[in-house]
Design a protein with these regions (language model features):
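A helix-centric hydrophobic-segment signal that preferentially recognizes long
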Residues: 1-204
Length: 204
């Protein structure tokens, strides 16, 4: 009977100190982070085929193609694991690398506007549609992660939860920069229905 009372008292104490809330919110952060990684990996997997397809019609756009390839390589050099959210510096490198890939892909899609044959290529149209869908899913996953980290970090900073967080090893989690989140949420778009007046290629 004594041990039952003791265990009940400990559980009540942990609940009162916010342990259950911290644990639940931390699990939500981890689940949302896993989805972020899945969607970024999905995008990275599209890049090689996109580059090869564009190269077939616009090989002279070497700077743009090289930029995308290098950005993809930089993303691949970072170990994207669940543990990344326990290392703020590694998280910042991951965010910067993904941002560079986003920028490079946008440039490549803008350049593709100058190549009507590329725009009419069925494989390219399919890949572009997949990329746009993936960018949308990335935006949704990022926003969910941002909100869950904001809630979690608020909880672990609050008294007396901060004491519980320190005692049980629940640090604050790094978050994405939200200043450009609205822009990130807009996937790169290419209008396949119109042909620019200068169609036919870009000369270096």
């Amino acid at each position: 009977m004594f041990w039952i009372v003791m265990i009940a008292s400990i559980l009540a104490s942990l609940t009162g100190c916010g342990y259950n809330a911290i644990q639940a919110e931390d699990e939500q952060v981890k689940a949302n982070w896993s989805e972020v990684l899945n969607q970024y990996q999905r995008r990275a997997d599209l890049v090689p085929n996109l580059v090869d397809t564009v190269k077939g019609y616009a090989n002279q756009e070497r700077d743009v193609l090289t930029s995308v390839t290098r950005a993809r390589a930089q993303v691949g050099s970072i170990r994207a694991t669940p543990e990344l959210i326990a290392d703020p510096q590694a998280f910042a490198r991951f965010e910067a690398a993904q941002g560079q890939l986003t920028s490079s892909l946008s440039r490549m899609l803008v350049v593709s506007e100058n190549y009507p044959q590329l725009k009419s290529d069925a494989n390219f149209r399919d890949l572009q549609a997949q990329l746009e869908g993936t960018e949308n899913r990335i935006a949704v996953a990022r926003n969910r992660y941002i909100r869950s980290v904001q809630a979690y970090n608020t909880t672990v900073r609050s008294f007396p939860n901060n004491l519980t967080a320190r005692a049980f090893g629940y640090p604050e989690r790094p978050n994405f920069s939200v200043g450009n989140e609205a822009e990130i949420s807009k996937p790169p778009r290419v209008d396949f229905g119109s042909t620019p007046a200068s169609a036919g290629g870009v000369s270096n």
